[in-house]
Amino acid sequence: MRHYIAIIVLFFQAHFISAQSVGKWSFSSQQLPVYEYTGRLPNIVLDKLGKDSYIQTDPYFLLGNYRLSLFVHASGIYQFMTGERAWARVNADENQQNYGSNNAQIIVKKGKNYKKTDLIGLKSIAIDTQRTQKLFGVGFAKYTYRLDEDLSCQRVISVKPSTKINTGNPAFVVSVTLKNSGKVVQELTYSEGMKLNYTPSAIQLYEPTKRPVSYLHKISVDKSTKTTIANLTCTPNLFLNFPSKNQRYIYDVNPPNVFMSTKSFDKDIKSYITVNHDTLSAHLTTILKPGETHTFHIIVGLNYENSKQAIQEQINELLANVNPSNNNEGFYQTAWKKQLPDFTAEKDQIIKREMLWNAYTLEAMATYCAYYGETIIPQGTIYAYHFGDNISNRDHLQAALPVCYTNPNLAKSIIRYVIMHSETDGEIKRGDAGNGCTPPSLYKESDEQLYFFNTLSQYLASTKDYAFLNEKVWLYPAENKKGEVVLNILKNYFVYLRDEIGRGSNGLVKMLNSDWSDSFFHENSPNVYAATAESHLNSVMVLAIFPKLITELKKSKNPEATALIIALENYRKEVSEAYFKDFGNRKFSARAYLNHRKKYGIDNVCIEPQGYLLQIPDLSISRKKEIYQYVKSKIYSPEKIGFRTREKPLWSTTGEGEDGGIWFSLEGSLIAGVATFDKQEAKELLHTISFQNFTDQYPSIWLGQWTGGDNVNSTLSQRDGLCFFWEKDRPNVFQGFCSHPHAWPLYCYLKIKE
């Protein structure tokens, strides 16, 4: 009986105690967003039926630059990740996927006794909300611990921004400040360690003894510089034929070196480095007199040069021009301020805060890919951070849309990266895994070229960089260094769209085996329907995007574009005639015709094509308003945070995921469509998909209050407010920080402001 009572108590605690908000926002001294996490730890989130949410119980934020990704948890745990050669955790926790292994403790001498306090983890002082404050801002995380009435410890993690494409310092600083507010001397030792366990995301799903490769390390300690360096090597556990380090490969055969160093500008602090098996640790011992404050710094990072001198230069660069005693908001607030757009004029404080946060998050997510020599914004979430895949290229192209305004060089790098996945016939590979490896895929996507046209059009419109059309970019595989000028690649993309993807019996653009929806054929075999399936979404994308592309090509005044412009205009006209013949006097677009009998979205509103339908420039405003009001009446109410994908599910009973959920990429395209005829309504919709509105609607669900996945379940589901996650046997591992809930709101905001 006691067992059942305990379960009931936990259930009600999870539902009712957590019904309060888990934190609050403010602004830093540089007027950048800061979030204070005040929720409980562990933060257990359940659905309406009391079932597991799959969300981690230790909420996390993201610090990063183009060469490192650092997920900092509310408990002080961090996941130190790199995506430079392959997505991998440097300090992976073998007991829990998508989690890190690090520790910190402080030992205070009390007479002849010693009192030890653990600072990090779900069994530490961090779970005590009365004794620990947790702040997460732009480029920093700050944990303040009240050890007793007189002694406090502040631990600040700082990440320096990248200011140029393909560059950045892949290291972070942990600054520890100890303060004695009492009247007696305090003698203490502080220690902080990180377990070295380099584990690519793609192989974390294997049991350690069954992994195809292992990463071994040889550790050395340089006492003179107080630095320890771990040289990593990749070793096969079964027969493999390793390539050279610069060739594409599913595994990273050239992992980085990992280092930890300690630095103090305070002569009263004794600091040193130790190694215990696979754990790198930094320590300080000091005596704090009444009223004294002592600070020391730990630098943890990656280095690819296998050089002690290079590591010291990296450390020096990280600490150059910083005030070591002024780290209350991290070391790099001023640098981050310069890197982000200026939204000072925005009077709506929620929108101002969230757009700054979104711009920062995209910069923190952006990742240099060594194989391609380009920097991208990955889709992130479970794709990159859980499975280790940079998929799909259409997602990277969508993430590039807002940075066409905020960081055009980054947008250009993303466009170049996508081109490097292209065959000479105009096919664009879906994405890659490992170090530039493109594994065989069951998907033959029909829309990559359309998303490319959209992003290139926006880039050209924003930058007027028409010379880009004459630049040469490597084609697939990039290591062969065989390239073509962008304009010719653009021509190949169009020919591929027209001839390989083609159009069906109704004159609509075909679907092949997937358009935006990867799941559309889960219930319908592509072997049966791929030859006939037509996509209304692809068709309206042509009608919405081609006019923009044609306009920019004309503005380029490039004589080599003349024939392409004519071909684009003719194709757009043909698709327009076919689409509007099918559309007739309907009040919403159909979704797809798999053949002449199997038609979807005829009497059931599906969101996918509606946003691009509203973006078609020669569709009258009165018709757009009529369409929008009807669509809104069918899939907006009674939703709390946006439009769901379906009026009624097409193939499922739960109405989750692509068959009834709320998807930020679709919300964004719809808002962009509404902005073409009613900017005030578009602003209101922007508030609807905001993190603040999610917090108001779902205060107990932390994932969605400052980041999220690519989707959220709608009210059709018993799990509304939660992300759809198909890995049912992997509880508490869902990794957020998808680019879409950051990129699309920011892009829509910038479009509305035009």
Which residues fall in each region the model found?
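Low-complexity, Ser/Thr/Pro/Gly-enriched N-terminal "stalk/linker" regions
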Residues: 21, 36, 324-387, 413, ...
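Acidic-aromatic substrate-binding/catalytic surfaces of carbohydrate-active enzymes
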Residues: 60-128
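The feature captures the catalytic groove of carbohydrate-active enzymes
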Residues: 176, 295-311, 385, 430-451, ...
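Beta-strand-rich recognition/accessory modules
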Residues: 171, 251-328, 529-532, 545
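Active-site acid/base region of carbohydrate-active enzymes
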Residues: 130-136, 346-364, 406-409, 418, ...
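Extended, loop-rich substrate-binding clefts of extracytoplasmic carbohydrate-active enzymes
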Residues: 111-171, 264-282
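Polysaccharide-binding surfaces and accessory modules of carbohydrate-active proteins
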Residues: 97, 143, 158-271, 282, ...
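C-terminal capping/lid segments that line or modulate ligand- or cofactor-binding pockets
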Residues: 23-42, 54-78, 358, 388-391, ...
